[in-house]
Amino acid sequence: KIMESLTEVKYKIGTTGTLQETKTHKLQLEGMFGPAYFVTTSADLMAEGTLAQLEIKALVLAYCDEERKLVSKMNYQEEMDWIVRNERRNMFINNLVKDLNGNTLVLFQFVEKHGRPLFDLLNKLDRKVFFVFGGTDALDREKVREIVEKEKDSIIVASFGTFSTGINIKRLHNVVFASPSKSRIRNLQSIGRGLRKSEDKDSVTLYDIADDL
């Protein structure tokens, strides 16, 4: 709507690191800005040292046959609810984060049934733990960012919606995908939170938790 109103603007420049591969989305952007021009890639920026080196660790959680049979009868939403409410799974995430060195970002999708229980678990650790979601005031989010930039071992438990874009924290050493997500764009944007470099950081590790059901 903003772009449609800028009828007298001579130059319009739009930038993104996650151009969707759908034809409709690309045509919409080209209609507003003109042809897309790919300047570089994340891999090239890592190779030249502009971005932190990314290591991805896929952690596949196994379940017993009884649990698999139970989940096989569920629809997608019921399966998601079962996964994020699973106490053993949340305890695994808690133990994983507890053993990580550096500042860690734990990303979740559902606030009440997943984010808050994870925060309650992690908040028992002897570390600074912050909880950020859609209801968190913008000024409070900025305070969290400023605090974490000065910390070495803090934990941010945040929703994908609030921390997948627009947050610039250089001193993030670990990113944990606590919730399953089918959104390629959101996953890429979330990974981008950890690719900033700092004086004492040149790499970031992504822990992608998968469920073998």
Residue spans of the language-model regions?
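N-terminal helicase ATP-binding lobe
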Residues: K1-T15, L19-T24, L122-K128, I147-K150, ...
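Conserved interdomain hinge at the start of the Helicase C-terminal
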Residues: V71-Q109, K113-K124
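Short, charged, surface-exposed secondary-structure boundary motifs
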Residues: T22-K26, G49, T136-R145, R184-G192
